[in-house]
UniProtKB/Swiss-Prot annotation:
Membrane topology label: Multi-pass membrane protein
UniProt KW keywords: Cell wall biogenesis/degradation, Endoplasmic reticulum, Membrane, Protein transport, Transmembrane, Transmembrane helix, Transport, Virulence
Record localization: Endoplasmic reticulum membrane
Ranges annotated as spanning the membrane: 49-69, 85-105, 123-143, 159-179, 185-205, 220-240, 244-264
GO cellular component, one term: endoplasmic reticulum membrane
InterPro entries, per database record: Chs7 (IPR022057)
Name of the protein described by the UniProt record: Chitin synthase export chaperone
Species annotation: Fusarium oxysporum f. sp. lycopersici (strain 4287 / CBS 123668 / FGSC 9935 / NRRL 34936)
Gene knockout outcome: Does not affect conidiation nor nuclear distribution, but leads to increased hyphal hydrophobicity and to reduced virulence on tomato plants.
C-alpha cells in the first residue's frame, strides 16, 4: 500500500511526465521511473516519432484558443482586472507550450535535460494556480487594479510559486537536499496539496463575491461549469486513465482527456471574468472595424433635399454645377 506522498499508484494509472523521474531504480536498466499500465500509442510523422499524439494535438488547440482569449481580453481597454487576467493567460500559454514539448517527446524521457523540463512544467503549473488566486482578490477592490502594486504583487507571487515548485521538483529528481526519487513527500505537497488549497480559496472567494456584491447570479453558472470540467479532468486522469486507454486500444488515454477538460476550465475562467467585468464604453476604443454603422448613400435626386439648398442667399459651389467651360464663362470673367 502506498504511503503519503508516494507516486507509485498515481503513476501506474496516469502517464504523468514526472513519473519517468521518480520511483525506485530498476535493476534491469539502472534507470529511475514508474511505467504506467497503459499509455497512448506514438505516431510517426515525417520520419519523426511523436509521443502522446492525441494529447499533443490538443495542446496545439489549447494554444490557439488561448491566443483568441488573449486577443478578446486585450480589446477591452478599460475592463477591470485586464492586466491581471492577461498574466494568467500568458502563464497558461507557457505551461501549454512546455507540456507540448514534453508530451510530444521533444525532450524524451531518460535524457539529461528531461528532469529540467519537467521541473519547469511543475513550476509553471504552480505559477498558474497562484496567479489565478491573486486574480480572485481583484474583484473585491482591496487595491486599485492595473497599478504597479497589483501587477507586481501578482508577478512576484507567481514567480515565488514557480521557484518553489521548480526547486523542489529538481531536488527530488536529482536527489538534492535530502529529497530523492523515492522521497517525494515534498513534491506531492507542493504540486497537489498547496495548489488544491489555492484553488479552493479562489472558488470560495468568487462565490462570495457574486452572492454578496453582484445582483446577477449567472456568473455562478460559469463557476460551476469550471469546477465540473476541472474535477472531471482530474478524475479521468487519475482514476480511469488506464481503463480508458485499454478500452480504446491505446489510441487515447487520460492525459488527452485531462488536457481537454483543463482547456474548458480555463475557458470558463475567461467566461466568468467577462461576465462580471463591465467596460467603460465612454473611454474605450474598439479594435473592430464595424464599430460605427455605415448607411447607404442617398439617391441623386434626394441628396440635395435639405434646408440649405433652399436658402436664397446661399452661393452655389462649382461642385454643384456640371463642368462645361465655354465662351460665356470667360467673357463674364474678363
Amino acid at each position: 500500500m502506498s504511503g503519503f506522498g508516494d507516486f507509485t499508484s498515481i503513476c501506474e494509472t496516469a502517464p504523468l511526465p514526472l513519473c519517468a523521474s521518480v520511483g525506485p531504480t530498476l535493476q534491469a536498466t539502472g534507470r529511475t521511473g514508474i511505467e504506467p499500465e497503459c499509455y497512448a500509442r506514438n505516431i510517426e510523422l515525417a520520419n519523426t516519432i511523436i509521443f502522446e499524439g492525441a494529447a499533443s494535438v490538443m495542446h496545439i488547440v489549447a494554444l490557439i484558443m488561448t491566443v483568441i482569449m488573449i486577443l478578446h481580453v486585450r480589446s477591452k481597454f478599460t475592463a477591470v482586472g485586464r492586466k491581471e487576467i492577461l498574466s494568467f493567460f500568458y502563464l497558461y500559454m507557457l505551461l501549454t507550450a512546455m507540456s507540448l514539448i514534453i508530451d510530444a517527446g521533444v525532450a524524451p524521457p531518460g535524457s539529461d535535460p528531461y528532469p529540467y523540463f519537467v521541473s519547469v512544467q511543475n513550476g509553471l503549473s504552480s505559477a498558474v494556480i497562484t496567479c489565478l488566486l491573486i486574480n480572485g482578490f481583484v474583484g473585491f477592490q482591496l487595491y486599485e487594479d492595473g497599478t504597479p502594486l497589483s501587477v507586481w504583487m501578482m508577478r512576484i507571487s507567481s514567480l515565488a510559486a514557480f521557484a518553489i515548485s521548480f526547486l523542489v521538483s529538481l531536488a527530488t529528481f536529482k536527489s538534492w537536499a535530502g529529497l530523492g526519487p523515492t522521497n517525494t513527500v515534498g513534491l506531492f505537497v507542493v504540486l497537489y496539496l498547496l495548489n488544491a488549497v489555492q484553488l479552493f480559496v479562489y472558488v470560495a472567494m468568487q462565490i462570495l463575491l457574486v452572492t454578496r456584491t453582484l445582483q446577477d447570479r449567472w456568473p455562478l453558472g460559469d463557476i460551476a461549469f469550471g469546477i465540473f470540467f476541472f474535477v472531471a479532468g482530474q478524475v479521468l486522469l487519475y482514476a480511469f486513465s488506464s481503463k480508458i486507454c485499454i478500452a480504446i486500444s491505446h489510441y487515447l488515454d487520460g492525459l488527452f482527456l485531462a488536457t481537454v477538460c483543463n482547456l474548458l476550465g480555463v475557458m470558463m475562467v475567461y467566461k466568468y471574468w467577462d461576465s462580471i467585468t463591465k467596460e467603460d464604453l465612454e473611454f474605450s476604443v474598439g479594435t473592430r472595424m464595424n464599430n460605427w454603422e455605415v448607411k447607404e448613400l442617398l439617391p441623386e435626386e434626394d441628396r440635395r433635399a435639405t434646408v440649405f439648398s433652399e436658402d436664397p442667399y446661399a452661393q452655389s459651389s462649382s461642385y454643384d454645377l456640371p463642368y462645361s467651360p465655354g465662351v460665356a464663362r470667360y467673357s463674364a470673367k474678363y
